[in-house]
Amino acid sequence: MKLKSFGVLGNPIKHSKSPLIHNACFLTFQKKLGFLGHYHPILLPLESHIKNEFLHLGLSGANVTLPFKERAFQICDKIKGIALECGAVNTLVLEDDELVGYNTDALGFWLSLGDEGYQSALILGSGGSAKALACELKKQGLKVSVLNRSARGLDFFQRLGCDCFMEPPKSAFDLIINATSASLNNELPLNKEVLKGYFKEGKLAYDLAYGFLTPFLSLAKELKTPFQDGKDMLIYQASLSFEKFSASQIPYSKAFEVMRSVF
């Protein structure tokens, strides 16, 4: 049976559960796919040229994580779906010798929320994940605000119709979303007292990091604010990516079931 290589490109990467859940799917569906897929964690140096690395490694598809999602958008031969709007790519697929970029973070995040009737969101951070979330939340009709320590990237969110801040706004929000990398460094993304104020009035504290109780989520727990880590988002976006890797042979709902069973 033909072997195809896939992977997740990032820095850092050792924390990623993507190889676990994708390899479970490749094993489960290999007969239907007609090939054996193997999915690797790939640590890229920060200065890497993503397309060159992808082709050099002989990959058929890959996920892209911190800090390469915006750079991945720039190197694709073709961009499809909501990735066109959000300027960030987390899924790369080789299709007819062209490198095609997708974004499954956006819908993956929304599916992970459930239908709770949220009206407003504060996104902390302005990177590729934040862009995808803002696009999807605006599409779903929420009022979206973005808080970042610098002006870097905020022009994108302004064009999208978000309220943008470099100092914490004195408002209440249903969703407070940590889309920064602070949790990977075991840090809070924002001043503790400011976060407490948001959590006390918010409906859900959401951290895109997963696999451990981050300082952000620990504070929410302390204040008895409902909280959620990025595990469900990971599985939803991964199952949507797997559908792309399988050329739509495996619907994301089937991939989701397998991934959920192993993580």
Swiss-Prot record:
Gene3D superfamilies, A to Z: Leucine Dehydrogenase, chain A, domain 1 (3.40.50.10860), NAD(P)-binding Rossmann-like Domain (3.40.50.720)
Pfam families assigned to the protein according to its UniProt record, in alphabetical order: Shikimate_dh_N
Keyword Amino-acid biosynthesis: yes
Chain sites annotated for binding NADP(+): 125-129, 208, 230
UniProt binding sites for shikimate: 16-18, 65, 90, 105, 210
EC numbers on record: 1.1.1.25
Domain of life: Bacteria
Keyword NADP: yes
Cysteine disulfide links: none
Catalysed reactions listed for this entry: shikimate + NADP(+) = 3-dehydroshikimate + NADPH + H(+)
Keywords of the record: Amino-acid biosynthesis, Aromatic amino acid biosynthesis, NADP, Oxidoreductase
InterPro entries (alphabetical): Aminoacid_DH-like_N_sf, NAD(P)-bd_dom_sf, Shikimate_DH, Shikimate_DH-bd_N, Shikimate_DH_fam
Enzyme class (EC, first level): oxidoreductase
Pathway where this protein functions: Metabolic intermediate biosynthesis; chorismate biosynthesis; chorismate from D-erythrose 4-phosphate and phosphoenolpyruvate: step 4/7
CC annotations in GO: cytosol
MF terms (GO), sorted A to Z: NADP binding; shikimate 3-dehydrogenase (NADP+) activity
Catalytic residue list: 69 (proton acceptor)
Function: Involved in the biosynthesis of the chorismate, which leads to the biosynthesis of aromatic amino acids. Catalyzes the reversible NADPH linked reduction of 3-dehydroshikimate (DHSA) to yield shikimate (SA).
Record-stated family: Belongs to the shikimate dehydrogenase family.
Subunit structure: Homodimer.
Name assigned to this protein: Shikimate dehydrogenase (NADP(+))
Organism of provenance: Helicobacter pylori (strain HPAG1)
